[in-house]
């Protein structure tokens, strides 16, 4: 039985940073065949329209198995770098799944990926790390950076990115334009101004 493979985006820093990191997370979800969920705090749930008709991208916080989701900080026990350092995830640099030690180990239920200004989980941007990350069901993405340009450097994503964005410099424009539309309460404030 194949479980869902999801990315849960966690808000961090100011609104502009949140928007840019959100579209980067969405792009990563597209490239890896994951469901993209947004863990918005209750006071920000109406900020943007739902981008997908008939469904929601909001994470149902009350049913989520990870406690204290907004209070994990930038380097919790399940952070990707800590899992690498403790050998709970092992990367051998080869694309052969049989040679990767994660095949013989139980895969963590979730990995916390911190791509904030401190760049705690830098190995994420190395292509050989995408194979073990692909085996994890839940990626909790804690980011305040627009990291979409860095995805272009990962060999496994380059062909798909070229197909999706023939003009590479249009990536942010197209993603922002598609994904982030102000919600009705925001439009109400804008029109009353």
Indicate where each model-derived feature is located.
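Secretory-pathway glycan-assembly enzymes, especially type II membrane glycosyltransferases
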Residues: 1-193
